[in-house]
Amino acid sequence: MYIDSHMHLINTKCFDRPTYDRLGQLIPKDTDINQLVEWMKAAGIEHCVCMGQDMHKVWNSEFGEVAVEDAFAKYPDFFVPFCSVEPIDEAGRFNQKNYDYMVDKLNNKGYRGVLFTPPYGQFNSNDPVMFPFYEAIDK
């Protein structure tokens, strides 16, 4: 069995245009989910772990969480959804809103894992503020 273990889907609604314009960056096009699944299946891939990426602290954007939801709804037997959250808020404190979002995705929406990106979220993986997130994931 072949599984693509890490890929991102793009939805242009998730990007903050003023931030990208200010930095001279182009916003990528939406991922064509049907075409992507066709290509992956043609390559022998049976499942795909897909995830967004929370990048609010650096880019004031998130990388396609909406697209993950759409893809999983359309192809629930193909996509394995992961959510992505920044666990620490702008003031360096526990991010309750993102914690609640993550728990809902894992417990009620069929999500199977979580992507944390310390460089984008500007936190350390061993920060004690992370522990409640790890504990919720471990349940």
Give, region by region, the residue ranges found by the protein language model.
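An N-terminally biased module of ancient metal coordination in phosphate/nucleic-acid-related enzymes
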Residues: 1-63
